[in-house]
């Protein structure tokens, strides 16, 4: 009887503990955002924009400017990733020429981050549109410096 009571209490405790544990992803994303921001600011970058968990985003880039883009995604199930930034243009040759792919940067808990860097050349006009593609969906953080 004591053994049965002990196992019942142990089982109830385990079930209670399992029901209390939620996803740590949002906390890990917040931690990654803080570390990313600190690193970017130390290297002279300024904050431009943050996109919530999304598969696509767009920014307008200025000439002669460096951009630093981070994709932070849930790596719980180790998904295959496809992140990139490319010039939004109907000309596929130009789009291919001006496409950048990131490299893996770090993992904080279940949040994994990829970093992408590019510098815009001198061009006529004020800005050019750049599309950011994230598969799987990711939080996207963009920083810039002249």
Predicted regions and their residues:
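Short, surface-exposed beta-strand/strand-loop-strand elements in extracellular ectodomains
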Residues: 77-94
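Solvent-exposed serine/threonine-rich low-complexity stretches and specific carbohydrate-binding patches
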Residues: 96-106
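Noncatalytic modules at the cell exterior or secretory-pathway interfaces
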Residues: 65-67, 116-137
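Beta-sandwich interaction modules
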Residues: 59, 104-124
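Non-catalytic extracellular/lumenal accessory regions of secreted precursors
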Residues: 20-55
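Sec/Tat signal peptide C-region and signal peptidase I cleavage site
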Residues: 14-19
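Short edge beta-strand/loop segments characteristic of extracellular beta-sandwich folds
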Residues: 68-72
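Sec-dependent N-terminal signal peptides
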Residues: 4-13
């Amino acid at each position: 009887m004591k053994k049965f009571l002990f196992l019942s209490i142990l089982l109830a405790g385990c079930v209670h503990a399992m029901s209390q544990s939620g996803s740590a992803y949002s906390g890990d994303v917040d931690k990654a955002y803080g570390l990313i921001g600190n690193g970017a600011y130390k290297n002279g970058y300024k904050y431009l924009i943050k996109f919530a968990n999304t598969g696509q985003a767009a920014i307008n880039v200025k000439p002669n400017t460096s951009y630093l883009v981070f994709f932070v995604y849930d790596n719980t199930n180790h998904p295959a990733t496809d992140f990139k930034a490319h010039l939004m243009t109907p000309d596929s040759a130009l789009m291919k020429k001006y496409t950048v792919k990131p490299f893996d940067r770090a993992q904080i808990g279940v949040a994994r981050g990829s970093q992408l860097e590019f510098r815009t050349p001198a061009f006529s006009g004020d800005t050019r549109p750049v599309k950011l593609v994230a598969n799987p969906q990711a939080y996207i953080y963009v920083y810039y410096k002249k």
